[in-house]
Amino acid sequence: MLALAGCILLWPNQQTYAAELQKDNYNGWYYENGQAYWYDNGVLARSKEVYDPQTDAWYWFEADGTMARDKDVFIVLNADGTGKWTRYDSDGRMVKGESYKNGAWYYFDLTTGAMAKGFVNLPQSDDPNGKWVYYDPITGKMQYGEQYIDGYWYYFDTATGKMAHGITNIPDNDDAGGKWVYYDSITGRMQYGEQYIDGNRYYFDTVTGKMAHGKYYRDGAYYYYDTVTGIMQYGEQTIDGDEYYFDTETGAMVTGEVERDGRYYYYDDETGAMLGLGEQIVKYAEKFLGTPYTWGGTSPDTGFDCSGFTQYVYSNFGIDLDRTSSAQRRQGEAVDEDDIMPGDLVCYSGHVAIYVGNNQIYHASDPIGYADLSSSYWQQHLIGAGR
């Protein structure tokens, strides 16, 4: 039984006709032929929202006065034809909050009942900040997955519709494992380029937003990002069996000569891979081209003699050679002349040099420089080579 304004009580299944009512002052519900109507001071509500304080609900009455049930209704609110979409349940009550219909979720304002469109923050029992979702600007249906909105990419959980924030893995047509991207922690917009997150540096492709992993070229230099986490790496790194070095501040891959921890290291000018030990020995030795010969000399400041020079060069690589050429000749492993490689010692009677390739030796002559190993003079005095 429904209580009516005006102290008239009607059963919903009663067939009560308008002629039986004092319509001039009648207010409230009226039922006829299974339809519900509403009167205000005897006037039938038509194309009108009505609030019933006793049920604490809003209702909509069509142009013929019948109450809308299980229906979406557009209500014009302004002279320009704009208004709001509303929804009424099977009892005719205006729907408020989340509503699931025909396979889609919708949201209706808790005060006005207006269908939400665009971004909406929904209350969540397990999160005081709620969750941001997105409703289609035309249909009002909750959207899922990647969405391009006003010039920005967003991602909404495929089950809950919740907007993604932070580092997120999303589907990628080119990779069964998906791609890692980053959404701003506040706006949810996809971010690009270098990003500083929780004390670590990452890089996201400037077109696709995909997180960089491994050795990665950008802005004129190579960088290295952890193959799992994507965090930028610094210092010495082993990649596919080769050694590389990445600047400890910028993360950029170094090439050529690098001085660190009191020693010199050499990396390929193109690939950045550390050169083999022999090649590094040659590169370092060539730093002293033109240094004068000094008998007994053991440093660039005083000049070098032959064994002082080789001892100094090899010490940069942790190789401890004896002081004299004859003692150095007895160190290491003997190498046939046909197998000699850059960085090997070439030993003569009373002299020692470094083989640099292409039948060239490099030694403390006066000044330090190159000589032709195949020349008759050096062949005449050659004793052997060692490694």
Q: For each predicted feature, which ranges?
A:
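Extracellular adhesion/carbohydrate-binding repeat motifs centered on closely spaced tryptophans
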Residues: 1-280
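Aromatic- and glycine-rich peptidoglycan recognition patches
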Residues: 14, 273-284, 319-336, 350-352, ...
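Extracytoplasmic/periplasmic, Sec-exported soluble proteins
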Residues: 53, 80, 175, 276-277, ...
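Short loop segments at secondary-structure junctions
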Residues: 64, 159, 317, 358-360
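Catalytic cysteine-centered active-site loop
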Residues: 284-342
